[in-house]
Amino acid sequence: MLSSLLAGAGLVALAASHPTSHGNALTRRAVDINAFRLTATSEYVNATVAVSEPSLRFLKRADYLETATELVKSVAKDATFRVVEDHYVGSNGIAHVNFKQTANGLDIDNADFNINVAKDGSIFSYGNSFYTGAIPANPLQKRDFSDPVDALKAANDKLQLAVTAEKASAESTGAKETFTLKGTSGAVKDPEAKLVYLVKSDGNLALTWRVETDIMSNWLLTYVDAATNQEIHGVVDYSADATYQVYPWGLNDPTEGSRAVVTNPWDTTASEFTWQGTGTTTYNVPRGNNAIAQSNTDGGSDYLSNYRPTSTSQNFSYPYTLQMSPPSTYVDASVTQLFYTANVYHDLLHSLGFNERAGNFEVNNNGAGGSGNDMVILNTHDGSDTNNANFATPPDGQPGRMRMFLWDLSTPNRDSSFEAGVVIHEYTHGLSNRLTGGPANSNCLNALESGGMGEGWGDFMATAIRLKAGDTRAKDYTMGSWIANDPKGIRTYPYSTSLTTNPHKYTDVNNLRGVHPIGTVWATMLYEVMWNLIDRYGKNDGAKPTFGANGAPTDGKYLAMKLVVDGMALPNFVQARDAILDADVALTGGANKCDIWKGFAKRGLGSGARYSSTARTGSTALPSGC
């Protein structure tokens, strides 16, 4: 999925004093990709409801997969479905199983059932977006649907993609009704087409060709009506607009401290081959199991042959000052900084539960589960845009791609690879897209409110990481101030626990139409929750969390981050709030219930809050016992 650090076309613009994005390739072609966002219709049964439901107690089977399967059968009695092969047991002991609904042997691409099974084998919670309407006749008998090549041409025409498809031909991949489209140009790899159903915004089922095109600025799944090729029913973008002499971890940007030489900074549990190896190869360039970093001044899709510094002694120490210009004079330092920041964050997220089984980004998973061969491609000085950054998140087993652009709002221009908050924000898109819906399903955050939560998670994680030793809940933080050369930053308000400094509340979302403004509301709520937990447990100012016997971080900052990671799911604020509360039940037995509720309620997401896409109802009420 693709989300940006800044708003692109079709999104609400930021305040006039803040920088705006040049947009992505589709923006420049005047196609509003947001008009094609999928709608999100789902239910979520939280842990409190699940434990009180007598019928769920009888579903327990020998293992978590059988238990989850029985739940789907009991809830969706007439549905056909398949298990998505990305199930795993998280670091908190909760098993996660994902199911995909099928019809006539074809996937219903946006019909998912996500189940969490507790340590004792009981149903902990679940989310369900299965289609409940009538199933049409089997289209594979008459085969009166369009050709996949024609579907590619339709997507290319309607979205104004830069793909040449006149000589394209379809070759079967061997999977059911799935084709590689050969003979094209303009895409990073051969486009693919798969025949699937899609639940449309009106609730009806449509037979579509899901056409996958990676054109660098956008990595798209386009759902083209298979009957007519005249209508696009939805678009998912895997990319996300907006990562060892370095600014050390914890320094957000050059204004917060000086560069230093760090030695062997990796966590050997998360990066057992160090950052420079894959278990079979050791590199003398910024490349390893988790990432490969390079400059990309032409903005192209190639990266293996691009420039990156080489050191036979693995001493990546290069000069950089704020006065250096042009960027080519400090490219070695930029590549090194990006590689460092992305790797530290990889290791931290691994400790918080985003490991191999959960779908993280690694070449060699070393037998720990999940799909490998998917390190993050890190492009600094990317020439395809300015004043932004982005991250493309395909499903587990395919590399993520981060592109860091130069910002021209100061003289000399500033390099986004030197602002850790931007790198962390972008990498968090990879985290949230892999965790929400399962590692094999990266298109669950495409609706407006869920897309906003994706942006908010990125801002929250970046802000939590930059907290300093002397900070209290009175400390405010902006986002992107250095890179934008603007003390106000790139968001409407700073992150603050003061309702005067940042007045955002849940009902503000009713009047917001962009993922970034919506994300600011969500991150503000998470900031409140974090400070409630810090006030209770204190703050660990080290680079890594310390865990108690129950597997929970012992301090408030890392506990908040752990709960956010464990609770990443679901399409709207109310359900995501419940998921964080459920994550706390799984991790601590619900010890922090009231601290979490108070943080959300302060910002209008209390127990009486209700979701509606057009008329959200706010509430400052707390549940009984708080």
Curated annotation (Swiss-Prot):
Q: How is the cofactor bound?
A: Binds 1 zinc ion per subunit.
Protein name, as recorded:
Extracellular metalloproteinase 1
- Give me the stretches of Polar residues compositional bias: 610-626
Residues noted as binding Zn(2+) in the record, renumbered to the chain: 425, 429
Q: Give GO terms for biological process.
A: proteolysis
| Induction, per UniProt | Expression is controlled by the prtT transcription factor.
**Does Translocase appear among the keywords?**
no
Enzyme class at the top of the EC tree: hydrolase
